[in-house]
UniProtKB/Swiss-Prot annotation:
PROSITE patterns named among the record's database cross-references: RIBOSOMAL_S15 (PS00362)
Superkingdom, taxonomy of origin: Bacteria
Pfam family, one: Ribosomal_S15
Record's keyword annotation contains Methyltransferase: no
Biological process annotations from GO: translation
Family: Belongs to the universal ribosomal protein uS15 family.
Protein name (Swiss-Prot/TrEMBL): Small ribosomal subunit protein uS15
Length: 89
């Protein structure tokens, strides 16, 4: 349930803070959110897939850590990111 290289490039372009930016928290959270959304769709039809569920929980935890970092360092960017990706907090 991974995302294609083209889709990943679109996400990076839409969320990059400058040219060539692939490591900023905004880009990382956007990519993780896309992967999480893909996996939640997978679980609607494969409810007993516990191995993938563990991977989903790991992705959510990683995204949560990045969001905590962003909130600690720049709350305005944090709030904008939550709003842009419709992430509940």
């Amino acid at each position: 349930m991974s995302i294609t290289a083209e889709r990943k490039a679109e996400i990076i372009k839409a969320n990059a803070t400058k040219a060539g930016d692939t490591g900023s928290p905004e880009v990382q959270v956007a990519i993780l959110s896309e992967r999480i959304n893909n996996l939640t769709g997978h679980f609607k039809t494969h409810g007993k897939d516990n191995h993938s569920r563990r991977g989903l929980l790991k992705l959510v935890s990683t995204r949560r850590s990045l969001l905590d970092y962003l909130k600690k360092n720049d709350e305005a960017r944090y709030k904008a990111l939550l709003e842009k990706h419709n992430i509940r907090r």
